Amino acid sequence: MHKRFVMVDGPDGSGKGIIVNALKKWAEQQQIKVFNLRDYCRENNRFPEPEEINDFDAIISSEMSYCWVGNALREEIVRKNNRNYSITSTAHAFSLDREILYNMVIIPALKQGKYVFQERGIISSIVYQPVQGNISLTEIMRLPGNKLALQNSPNLLIISQVAPETIMQRLSQRQKQNKAIFEEINFQRRVEQRYNSQWLKNLFESHGSKVVYLDTNFPKTVEETEKEAIKIWEDFLEKN
């Protein structure tokens, strides 16, 4: 199987969307036909059937998804609404959303040799959920969707790095506040430590991923981040 699965992960406000967009631009410059799964799910409130993506060579994806379980997560479960869903329920919801995404889109696309550029994934559950509540890493990794994702780990994992203080500043400047429960400074500091940990890197390397870090702290510009992301990807392609 071609090594064409790239996952971009990191704290909120760390530039993940910029990096994925850079990979999308790269694909378009290579005359690769791109299917934007996020836009499709927003517009149709469902995942595409396999035949609907046959004519495309690259998929732009993200977690949480933008339909079904993903919408329940975005609009209800992880919002600040004082309904306080348990960490177990939250973890199961993320796992189910992931299981559907992988079975319906990611795995079939990779088997067909398509590129997959995805924002967030199983690494987010591993980083965030033990910080959010009383749940062990072992329990998280045993959930079916999470097991499936680890069995189909990305070939290249780009972790975007930024200081927690910068994250809070960036999030406060966003036009659309998503009201997620994760946007607290102490929470972000703990998240940063986990993303930068050696054990996390070792975990994904043991599942076949190449792990690369991309610093997006000021004064790095959007253009510089995009350029560095493409260089990381092209260097990976050259060696694989």
Where do the protein language model's features map onto the residues?
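Hydrophobic positions on the alpha1 helix immediately C-terminal to the Walker A/P-loop
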Residues: I19
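Hydrophobic anchor at the beta1->P-loop junction of P-loop NTPases
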Residues: V8
